[in-house]
Amino acid sequence: MALLALSFRAYGLPLFERTGSIELAIPSSAIGASIGHSTSFSSFSFEPAFWVEFFGNASHPNELTFKLLAHIFERGGQPAIRPGGITMDSMIFDPSAGDPVRTISEEGGVYRTTVGPAYYESWSNFPDNIKFVSTLNFGNDSLDIARDMAVASVKYQQNRIAYFELGNEANNYPSERWDNSTEKYVQQWQNWTETIDEAVANDYSHGRWWASSATTDNTSLHVRPVDLIPAGIDSTGDVSVFSIHFYAFATCDPERAAKATIPNILNHTDLVTYADEEIYPSAKAALDAGKKWVIGEFNSIACSGAPNVSDTFAQALWVVDVQLINAVRNASAVYLHQGATLVFQSSQQVNSAGDDGSPGYSTYDLFYPRDGSKRGKARALPSYVSQLFLVEALSSSDTRVRALDTPEGLSQDHFSAYAFYVDSRLSKLALINMMPYYANSTSDYTASFDVSQHCGPHGKAWVKRMTAPYVDTGDTQMVTWAGQSFETGSVVGDIEIEEVARDGVVEVRGSEAVLVLFNKEDVYGL
C-alpha cells in the first residue's frame, strides 16, 4: 500500500482539526476493489412522456441532445437508455399512432402517453452499440397493454434491447392492488412476465428482466430486491438484474424541500450512509443470489429537483460522488434520471409546469432540451460536465474502483477519493473536494496532494479539472471540464490538460474535482 502525501490550507472550520502534511493511503493493487465496470456504467433514464422534447423523432432528432451525447460517445462511453419513470406506467402502444403524444388530465398531470412505431424507430438515431431497456406499463393493470409494448419493442428494435422492465416504483401503487402483500405482487409479476415471454418472438425476453425498480420510501408494500428475493421472484429464472432507485432528498413537500440544500446534498458522509442503509441491503441480496444489481433510476432531489440547488455546479459534484459511491458497491450500472415536472407526484411539490402548459424541465436535468417559458432557452446545465468526468474515469473496459479512506485531519463530510485500476494496476485517481465554496467564503479550502509516488516511469502524470467559480454557479458558460464549457452542445475554449510538476503536487480547491491520470494513453485530448 503506497501513501499519498497531502497538505491543506485554509480549512478554517472546526471539522478540520489539524494542519500540515498528512498522507492518503492508496493500495497499489486492485485486491479488494469493485467488480470490473463496463463503459456503460454511467447510463440514463428519460421520462418517456417527454421523449420527443429530449430526442425529437426518427427524421428530426434533437440537435442539442445528440451534440451533448456525442461528447460522451467520442470518449468511449456507451450509456444504456431506459425510457422509464412514472409515465411508463401510463404508456400504451398504438400501431396507428405517430410520435409519442401526451394526454393531460384535468389536474394538469400526464394521464397517458401514446406511442406508435415512430417511437421505437427513433431509437435508431443512437449509435448501434447503444442498448435500451424496454419499459412496460404495469401501473394500468392491463396485461394486454404491457404485452403489446413488449412485442412492439422487439418487432422494431430487437437488436437494441438489453433488458425488459415491468413497472416503475410499484411500492407507490394503490395499496388495494395487492393488499400490501409481497407474495401477491410476485405472483402477478411472474404470471405477466411468463405470458410476455411466450408472446415475444423466439422467447427473446426470458432471462432478461429487471425486477423490483422500487424506491427506498417507507411504504406498506415491500418490494425492494431484499424483499423480493426471499419471496422467490426469480424462481423461474427470469430475472437478470435487480433494480432499486436512489433519491436521498426531495421537494415533494415543504418539509423535505427544506432539507434539499447545497450543503446537505454535498455531505459525503450522509450520502454513504444512505447508500449503506437504504440501498446496499438490496444490492447484497442480489449479489448473494448471483445476480447483477443497478441503480435503475436516481438523481439528487426527487420531484424534479430544487431550483438554485440542483441546477448549480453543486449538482455536478453530487453526480460524480454518488456514481462512484455505487460503483464501489458493485452496481453494474447507474441510470441518471431526466425529465420534467409531473403533477401526479405530489400536490405539495415545489416545481410546476410552465404557465402555458409547456414542460417544466427538472432542474436536476443535465440539459434543457427545448426552449420553454419555465426554464428559458435550451442549454446544457452545470451538471453536464460530470458525465465527461465519469466517462473518462471509466473509459477502459473492466475498470475497478476503490474508495479511499479519508485521512485524519480532513473532513469525511466534505472529501472523497477514488482509485481506478485497470489490469490490476493503478491507472487514475479522483479527488473530490465537496466543501462548499461561495463568493463570500473566507477561504477557498484548497487541499494539496503529492502524487509523485504513483507517476509513470518518467515521473509524469496528468490532471483534468472539473470546476466553476463557486459551488452555486448556475451559468453553464462558467463551468468547465478540462478548461472547456458546453452550454450549447459545442465545445468552447481550448482543452487544458495539466501536467503534474516535478514536485508531484496536485491542488484541489473547495467545490472542485480533479481526475489524475497516470498513463498518457488514457488522457483524452492529449
Where are these regions (language model features)?
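Acidic, Ser/Thr/Pro-rich beta/coil linker or hinge segments at domain junctions
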Residues: D444-E512
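Conserved beta-strand positions
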Residues: F46, P83, S134, L166, ...
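Carbohydrate-binding surface patches
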Residues: E408-G456, A468, S511-V514
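Noncatalytic carbohydrate-binding groove/subsite architecture in carbohydrate-active enzymes
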Residues: D148-A150, T182-V322, R329
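Fungal secretory targeting signals
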Residues: M1-T19, I81, L526
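N-terminal catalytic cores of secreted or lumenal carbohydrate-active enzymes
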Residues: F16-A211, T219-L228
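Conserved, mostly hydrophobic/aromatic
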Residues: F44, I81, F164, E169, ...
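Aromatic/acidic polysaccharide-binding cleft in carbohydrate-active enzymes
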Residues: A302-S416
